[in-house]
Each structure stands twice: as structure tokens, then as C-alpha cells.
């Protein structure tokens, strides 16, 4: 795994980082206006609009946001990167990066993949995943954590996006499936393997794999309320 910037760093643009900045700029603009600094508020609102336009121009592939727009030319064999649907797409909707047409396109893509995937849910961290071992960590096999694991975090964001963009039945369906999932074991995990097996200390690349995940469950709760 690459935790530092050096001569071997692959540079590129990730859509989720940009939607996060967009949301932050909007919040900052609102705070400035609230405290009477309208000029600064207008400045950050303009920065948000400009970033949104650039992100959509660069990252949108016509159906969803490309996982990683490369600045460093490199080819990764064993996966069609143009088809990779990554976890921040529903977040992009909820952060306001999309218009209604793009939001609908993203939601419909998840619904399509639900019909074709062998996984128990369409809440992919990324789909299709990278080949086993590509990150230099033997635990990051296909279907594990951020390499194709099934994440309630994604499901919660997707449910919220569904409720806000005309797919209420789909949003309810996601919440019901999550309710059944946690009801079976009275536990919720950060991620699951596609076959439904939960994360464990032995299979996780994160420091802890607890049965009391708050990241995914809070996203589901946000969609519910």
C-alpha cells in the first residue's frame, strides 16, 4: 500500500474527493453569509459552482462518475476500469454534485447491477474490484473491504439519494434489507464479503473489525430519518 507521495505515486482525480470539497465550500459560504460576511460567502459559493462544473466535465462518464481519472498513464490488467462503480457515487448525489438527470442515472445503475451481481446486495465499495494483491496487501482480495466489499455505508447513502430523487420504494427496500441483515445476527459491520460473511479481524485491513459499526449504520439512520 502507498501511504506516501514519491516518484512512484500515480496521480489522478477521484470524484468523491471533489464532491466533498464542493459540499464543504457550500457550507463555508453559508457560514460566512450567516455571520454577515456576504462578500466572502459569495466568493466561496462561486468556488463551489466552478468546482462542480469542472468535476462534472472531467469525471462524469455519461452514466456515473469515473472512479479514478488518471493523470499518470498506467494500465491495470485484470479489470475494466471504465466499468468501475465506486462508493462515492451516491454521496455525490447527496452532496449536490449532480443534477436530477445524473442522480437518476446513478441510482438506475445500482438497480441494474443489483439484477446481475452475485453479491447479496449492490452496496459495493467498488464494482468490479481490482485483482487480488494489486495493492500489495494479501488481505485486499476481491470482495474485501474497499476492493469490492459490500458496505452499509453505500447502502445508506444510496437509500437517501433514492428518497430525494423519486425512488422512494427503492429507498424503503434498501432499509428493509438492512434491517433484516442486522436482525439476523444482532450486529452490523463496516463491510461484508459479497457472500454475506461479515468482516473479521482476520480478514480486515482496518485496525479493528467490530460488530458495532457506526459508519454504515449512521448512513442508514440518516436515510431513515
Residue ranges and their predicted role:
Residues 12-15, 145, 149-152, 214-215:
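Short, well-ordered coil↔helix boundary/capping segments
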Residues 217-225:
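Terminal, non-catalytic domain-edge segments
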Residues 107, 155-156, 175, 221:
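A general structural signal for well-ordered alpha-helical packing
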Residues 141-168, 222-223:
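C-terminal substrate/ligand-recognition segments
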Residues 1-12:
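Aromatic- and acidic-residue-enriched carbohydrate-binding clefts of CAZyme catalytic domains
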Residues 10-14, 20-135, 175-210, 214:
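Catalytic cores of carbohydrate-active enzymes
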Residues 1, 16, 85-88, 151-156, ...:
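Short, solvent-exposed loop/turn segments at the edges of secondary structure
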